Swiss-Prot record:
Pathway named in the protein's UniProt entry: Cofactor metabolism; pyridoxal 5'-phosphate salvage; pyridoxal 5'-phosphate from pyridoxamine 5'-phosphate: step 1/1; Cofactor metabolism; pyridoxal 5'-phosphate salvage; pyridoxal 5'-phosphate from pyridoxine 5'-phosphate: step 1/1
Reaction equations catalysed: pyridoxamine 5'-phosphate + O2 + H2O = pyridoxal 5'-phosphate + H2O2 + NH4(+); pyridoxine 5'-phosphate + O2 = pyridoxal 5'-phosphate + H2O2
Protein name: Pyridoxine-5'-phosphate oxidase
Binding sites annotated in the UniProt record for FMN: 95-98, 110-111, 116-117, 139, 174-175, 219, 229
Family from the record: Belongs to the pyridoxamine 5'-phosphate oxidase family.
Modified residues (Phosphothreonine): 238
Complex formation: Homodimer.
Record-listed E.C. numbers: 1.4.3.5
Organism annotation: Rattus norvegicus (Rat)
Gene Ontology biological process terms in this record: pyridoxal phosphate biosynthetic process; pyridoxal phosphate metabolic process; pyridoxamine metabolic process; pyridoxine biosynthetic process
Length: 261
């Protein structure tokens, strides 16, 4: 007698014992239904209205939300962000890294040019950033072209880092295949001895980027799922054609709109 059952759908609720619970289900070929996993966000009285914008310049609005995130004791790294890049033929990749500066011109981050993201930015210099501040029920999404920062700026930032981090950047040819972790340990120890009394030179393959924002979307969660989304866009040729009734002028060349959640 054979059984034709290929998989089982398991509706997730908090198990009596956590350790190994998901691994146990996966090993049994179960499909985990996580639909019931949800939490309450904000109430309608806390909705993010257009009148609540601190500025019609989205970079200033970002600065306001970022400051709140930095001051929130439940957020460990307010500058943590997801960077999404894409190959020329449309294959995306994403990873978490840290924002290292922002200003009127854009968002700065540093990495290894030989990494996957570095190669993708070289062949397709456009990217998206996502900041998610879960305790505040807020998210900011940014899109735009990316350019390498001047070598001098990268050099200055590199040498502002702890020496151990500088050595780590030299040790790791990011995204390359290595035999094991011991390989990294040995190389790190060797370079630690080599540069004990001297400056660590910045590798040519390490540097920074700036993302020039063309789209910035501010999202705030609502318990009833009628989330707030206000998006700013620029670079639009609006001079010869009037804006629609739901599109509004922001500062400089920005316009903004409310999007359905």
């Amino acid at each position: 007698m054979t059984c034709g059952l290929l998989s089982v759908t398991v509706t997730f609720r908090r198990p009596a014992k956590w350790p190994g619970y998901f691994r146990h289900l996966c090993c049994r070929g179960a499909v985990m239904d996580l639909g019931p996993m949800r939490k309450s966000y904000r109430g309608d009285r806390e909705a993010f209205e257009e009148a609540h914008l601190t500025s019609l310049d989205p970079m200033k609005q970002f600065a306001s939300w970022f400051e709140e995130a930095v001051q929130c004791p439940d957020i460990g790294e307010a500058n943590a962000m997801c960077l999404a890049t894409c190959t020329r033929d449309g294959k995306p990749s994403a990873r978490m890294l840290l924002l290292k500066g922002f200003g009127k011109d854009g968002f700065r981050f540093f990495t290894n040019y030989e990494s996957r993201k570095g190669k993708e930015l070289d062949s397709n210099p456009f990217a998206s950033l996502v900041f998610y501040w879960e305790p505040l029920n807020r998210q900011v999404r940014v899109e735009g072209p990316v350019k390498k920062l001047p070598e001098k700026e990268a050099e200055n930032y590199f040498h502002s880092r702890p020496k151990s981090s500088q050595i780590g950047a030299v040790v790791s040819r990011q995204s390359s295949v290595i035999p094991d972790r011991e390989y990294l340990r040995k190389k790190n120890e060797e370079l630690g001895q080599l540069y004990r009394e001297q400056e660590v030179p910045k590798p040519e393959y390490w540097g920074g980027y700036i993302l020039y924002p063309q789209v910035m979307e501010f999202w705030q969660g609502q318990t009833n799922r009628l989330h707030d989304r206000i998006v700013f866009r620029r670079g639009l040729a609006t001079g010869d054609s009037p804006l629609g009734p739901m599109t509004h002028h922001g500062e400089e060349d920005w316009v903004y709109e409310r999007l359905a959640p």
